[in-house]
């Protein structure tokens, strides 16, 4: 369920991105803050599933073979589609090949494609992490916390040093080979939150106290001029900033703790599993549908029409993904 909600939230982020700025209402920034947890939640759910010992029951070779047979073709095809078709052919402008290559190497060809090298990197190191963590919830919590703390420190160095040195110190250059590194903490903590979930009372405290407080802090970070320039930019909400990271962890850990014992009927479980399995394809195709509707002149003049756009893109993306999974050629890239 969290995976389904997360991908819908990702779509909402991209639909509303052009309608949010510093002049937006506080309510819109509250929504923006909550939506910022979508990608971290998706990564945590992936970690909860992939780092389970049962995922390696046939060996790491089988695990990697199965995952990479899906991820590598999808990465190649969708990068070519968005960078080539959407980014070059449809724009009608002569490409700057040097800029295109730089965008490919830095995973910035399209707003959502960074996720592909990110999840590829996490998949490749999964057997190593699983070998250490095993079925120990305690090890998962410790390993995940260390990795998350490392990410916060490393990503904070550039804004903190920009005003002190002639040039900011950048210890980690984000690119297709390194994008996954700051997200290892989310990945492992997703496993920790499932293998050793917090008890009901702490989970309620997280959900009812920590999440609202951290949401308020994230809204402040969006609106405050403190985050416009270094060193205050260290608090600017990104997936690896203290505000969003703590909010994402509090929300997902609380939901996993509270929802661990929820049960549904077998029919509902089959439905949710089918829809959940389609979320990767939804993530990949939704941006093309969004751009297509905007190119056709879909009006975005009110909250109602923007909400309608969100519904259309979501339904369209799920339809394409679910139907595509029944077509042999498309199944491999969705």
Q: Predicted segment positions?
A:
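Functionally critical transmembrane alpha-helices in membrane proteins and complexes, commonly lining
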Residues: 1-53, 71-79, 109, 181
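C-terminal "closing" transmembrane helix and its immediate cytosolic amphipathic cap
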Residues: 259-272, 287-334
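Hydrophobic alpha-helical segments with transmembrane-like composition
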Residues: 86-90, 98-164, 173-195
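Alpha-helical transmembrane segments and terminal signal-anchor/GPI-anchor hydrophobic tails
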Residues: 199-268
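Transmembrane alpha-helical segments and their boundary/interface "anchor" motifs
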Residues: 33-41, 53-111, 117, 122, ...
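Membrane-embedded alpha-helical segments of multi-pass membrane proteins
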Residues: 34-45, 108-109, 113-124, 177-188, ...
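Aromatic-anchored segments of alpha-helical transmembrane domains
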Residues: 8-15, 146-159, 210-224, 288
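Membrane-interface helix-boundary motifs at transmembrane edges
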Residues: 55-65, 129-140, 193-205, 260-270, ...
């Amino acid at each position: 369920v969290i995976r389904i909600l997360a991908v819908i939230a990702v779509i909402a982020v991209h639909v509303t991105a052009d309608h949010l700025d510093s002049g937006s209402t506080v309510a819109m920034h509250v929504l923006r803050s909550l939506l910022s947890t979508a990608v971290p939640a998706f990564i945590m759910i992936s970690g909860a599933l992939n780092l389970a010992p049962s995922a390696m029951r046939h060996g790491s070779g089988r695990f990697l073979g199965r995952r990479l047979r899906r991820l590598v073709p999808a990465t190649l095809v969708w990068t070519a589609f968005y960078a080539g078709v959407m980014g070059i052919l449809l724009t009608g402008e002569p490409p700057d090949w040097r800029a295109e290559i730089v965008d490919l190497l830095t995973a910035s060809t399209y707003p959502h494609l960074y996720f592909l090298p990110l999840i590829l990197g996490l998949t490749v190191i999964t057997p190593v992490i699983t070998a250490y963590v095993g079925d120990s919830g305690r090890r998962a919590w410790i390993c995940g916390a260390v990795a998350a703390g490392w990410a916060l420190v490393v990503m904070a160095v550039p804004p903190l040093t920009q005003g002190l040195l002639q040039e900011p110190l950048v210890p980690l250059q984000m690119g297709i080979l390194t994008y996954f590194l700051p997200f290892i903490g989310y990945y492992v903590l997703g496993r920790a939150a499932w293998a050793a979930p917090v008890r009901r009372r702490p989970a309620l405290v997280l959900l009812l106290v920590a999440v609202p407080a951290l949401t308020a802090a994230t809204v402040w970070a969006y609106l405050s001029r403190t985050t416009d320039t270094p060193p205050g930019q260290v608090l600017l909400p990104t997936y690896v900033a203290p505000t969003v990271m703590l909010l994402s962890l509090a929300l997902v850990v609380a939901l996993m703790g509270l929802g661990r014992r929820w049960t549904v009927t077998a029919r509902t479980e089959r439905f949710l599993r089918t829809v959940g399995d389609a979320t990767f394809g939804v993530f990949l195709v939704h941006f093309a549908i969004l751009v297509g509707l905007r190119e056709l002149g879909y009006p975005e003049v009110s909250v109602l029409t923007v909400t309608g756009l969100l519904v259309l893109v979501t339904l369209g993306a799920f339809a394409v993904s679910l139907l595509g999974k029944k077509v042999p050629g498309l199944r491999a890239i969705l």
